[in-house]
């Protein structure tokens, strides 16, 4: 029967991954943003796509990883011992700490600044790759485009703009809850992005979403 077939397909799906590496690889290789978004819509999660201007730097880039949220702020030029965190007196604030804190399979996700300078670049990509991170998604621009493309590092941004964040902005917090557009992003949520955009899968529903998206994707291929 159809019910039995569905059961066996989902049982087979559950055997396709036994750890986070395999789960995220399955997302990258077998899913796409539209089907993930459709599934979350049906579950009542109707605001999970980042604004449409956040696009891959190259059309074939796909990102699937765990969110490491980073909060940026425009730099007012203020310095001194009155600051709660002396790291904020550094030229990039907590940016170097954020890069150093990246873990395997994580995605650097940044918001909070005005769209007047680049939030990601080649050297940041190099640091991220060395730490096992799998992508960057920024609510703003990226730069050093040639270098990022040569590294084949998935980068999603508003597009290319060379103006540097120093002395215009600083990272002020990391591993915190952030919001991009209407989407709340918490540490550990799954970030999935492809040519059609970037969506956020809340950690608490990731298993149900990915299983349903896999079933829907494979069902559509059979039609």
Question: How should these model regions be labeled?
Answer:
Residues 37, 47-48, 66-69, 106-109, ...:
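Structural motif
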Residues 40, 128, 189-191:
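Buried hydrophobic positions in well-ordered alpha/beta secondary-structure cores of metabolic enzymes
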Residues 1-14:
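Short, Lys/Arg-enriched N-terminal segments with co-localized hydrophobic residues
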Residues 190-223:
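A hydrophobic, small-residue-rich beta->alpha segment in the mid-to-C-terminal subdomain
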Residues 97-139:
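Extracellular/luminal Protease-associated
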Residues 137-139, 145-193:
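A contiguous pocket-lining binding segment that forms or flanks enzyme active sites
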Residues 12-98, 219-221:
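Intrinsically disordered, low-complexity regions enriched in acidic/Ser/Thr/Pro/Gln residues
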């Amino acid at each position: 029967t159809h019910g039995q077939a569905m059961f066996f397909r989902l049982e087979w799906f559950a055997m396709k991954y036994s750890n986070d590496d395999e789960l995220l690889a399955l997302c990258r290789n077998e899913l796409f943003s539209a089907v993930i978004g459709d599934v979350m819509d049906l579950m009542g999660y109707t605001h999970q796509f980042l604004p449409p201007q956040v696009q891959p730097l190259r059309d074939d880039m796909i990102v699937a990883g765990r969110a490491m949220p980073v909060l940026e702020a425009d730099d007012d030029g203020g310095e001194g011992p009155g600051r709660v965190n002396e790291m904020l007196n550094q030229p990039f604030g907590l940016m170097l700490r954020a890069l150093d804190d990246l873990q395997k399979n994580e995605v650097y996700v940044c918001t909070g600044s005005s769209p007047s300078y680049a939030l990601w670049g080649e050297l940041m990509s190099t640091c991220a790759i060395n730490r096992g991170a799998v992508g960057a998604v920024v609510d703003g621009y990226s730069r050093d485009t040639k270098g990022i493309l040569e590294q084949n590092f998935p980068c999603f941004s508003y597009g290319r703009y060379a103006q540097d964040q120093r002395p215009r902005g600083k990272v002020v917090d990391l591993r915190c809850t952030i919001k991009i557009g209407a989407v709340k992003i918490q540490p550990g949520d799954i970030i999935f992005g492809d040519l059609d955009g970037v969506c956020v899968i809340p950690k608490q529903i990731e298993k149900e979403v990915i299983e349903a998206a896999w079933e829907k994707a494979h069902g559509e291929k059979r039609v």
